[in-house]
UniProtKB/Swiss-Prot annotation:
This is Imidazolonepropionase. It is found in: Cytoplasm. 4-imidazolone-5-propanoate binds at R82, Y145, H178, Q246, S323. SUPFAM superfamilies: Composite domain of metallo-dependent hydrolases, Metallo-dependent hydrolases. Its cofactor is Zn(2+); Fe(3+). It catalyses: 4-imidazolone-5-propanoate + H2O = N-formimidoyl-L-glutamate. Belongs to the metallo-dependent hydrolases superfamily. HutI family. The gene is hutI.
Amino acid sequence: MSWDQVWIDVNLATMDPSISAPYGAITNAAIAVKDGKIAWLGPRSELPAFDVLSIPVYRGKGGWITPGLIDAHTHLIFAGNRANEFELRLQGASYEEIARSGGGIISTVKACREADEAELFELGRQRLNALAKEGVTTVEIKSGYGLDTETELKILRVARELGKHHHVDVKTTFLGAHAIPPEYKDNSDGYVDLIINKMLPAVIAENLADAVDVFCENIAFNLEQTERVLSAAKAAGLEIKLHAEQLTNMGGSALAARLGAKSVDHIEYLDEAGVKALSESGTCAVLLPGAFYFLRETQKPPVDLLRQYGVPMVLASDFNPGSSPICSTLLMLNMGCTLFRLTPEEALTGLTLNAAKALGIEDNVGSLVVGKQADFCLWDIVTPAQLAYSYGVNPCKDVVKNGKLVHQ
């Protein structure tokens, strides 16, 4: 066989649903790569003969290979920090109170408007490197800290540039509808007009976004405004998603499902009717335990109902300066289990196959299947559950991206 590389002495957590074993596991396995794709995988005993003198062979020392991790919800590009708000919350101020007093997202908006692209790129690069060291091979990055045309475009340009200069694939999401900017404080509908009539066309003209998102909440955009933005995005051929039911149950998830959204994110206050709507539309539920933990929330997402209705559950970092300044997907695995009572297998599925579904890229990544992109990680672990069980010592030993060894 003519391959570019072969990995032996490994166990595979393929996350392939067609394999009945937990994690889609194949023990005592091997995997071969050709032209950036997975060319063969299976039990080591069934590996076809190949020229060991001309093809690089990597020995996994009994470790586990998983698909590359996918962080499907981040706000990775921002300037400044909000440590002062952290102190205020510890003194009793709520997220909503801080936002209504001009803090929260708006304080980060000011810092981002003042920062240039070079500064934002370097900050984003450092954060992306941190995720990459934990086995992340694909990441979604949202805008939303500009809230004017110039700065929203600036953030999205930086995200695109990061994708060009880093081995991690970057998917971009336009989140101009993240908050009401100060200049539109008494005219939120006017700001929605700006998003639809000026921002969105400018984003499309430069091909800066793969999807459009809205923060549907009582401190941000109402249902009617949300539908206007998402409908405009959908009409333009972009994927849509939604921050929904984080602080209250406004019915945003049902709206997103009706419009065919790829995902609804946060969903702590999602009810059974909303879960049923997601199930019927195939929309993913993105769980964000970092924000739940950092904001010290008590209302948990309805995991049992999501299981009951077969809604794909995704885990993501929601890395951002205000509600989840936690740049770690491995910690999300642990939090997903300890805070939301996911099983370790559900948690890992949420950072691989289901995360790919939330981004619409499941045909190419998210599981180890012949023909898919060769994005995978070798972990120094004895069982896949160990990734969720233990935190603090990074067990990621090697990362292969598009068939190339990028971290060793």
